[in-house]
């Protein structure tokens, strides 16, 4: 089931990809993304902002495709990593650059690095 699809369609141009083709494009979201970006003019590409959210492999793959067409400052990502305290004290969600997902995120520019093992 795809949650909030109708709500998203009210505020954005929505393109859906499902692995099994049960809704929208059949295949990986990165394939749909690349096809859509290839259709756009330079002016359209320059005005895009991406908000990636989901499992690490998908977010990193999407950001990689986006970087082929757009600048890093247009790409923001949130990855589902474990957070413990939620207020930045324990450091469980700290990435190698010191950013803490619980207080500096959840969306960070580019593709956030995996938190360091504690």
Model-derived regions, located:
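Local cysteine-cluster metal-coordination motifs and their immediate loop/turn environment
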Residues: 56-61, 80-106
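Generic secondary-structure boundary signal with a strong preference for alpha-helix termini
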Residues: 66, 98-102, 117
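Short microdomains enriched in Cys/His and/or Lys/Arg
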Residues: 107-118
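FNR/FR-type flavoprotein reductase catalytic core
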Residues: 1-83
């Amino acid at each position: 089931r795809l949650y909030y699809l109708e709500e998203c369609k009210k505020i954005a141009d929505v393109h859906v990809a499902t692995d099994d083709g049960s809704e929208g494009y059949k295949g990986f979201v990165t394939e749909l993304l690349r096809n859509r970006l290839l259709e756009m003019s330079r002016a359209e590409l320059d005005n895009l902002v991406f908000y990636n959210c989901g499992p690490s492999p998908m977010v990193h793959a999407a950001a990689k495709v986006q970087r082929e067409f757009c600048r890093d400052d247009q790409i923001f990502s949130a990855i589902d990593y474990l957070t413990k305290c939620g207020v930045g004290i324990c450091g469980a969600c700290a990435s190698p650059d010191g950013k803490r997902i619980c207080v500096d995120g959840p969306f960070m520019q580019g593709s956030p690095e995996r938190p360091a093992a504690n």
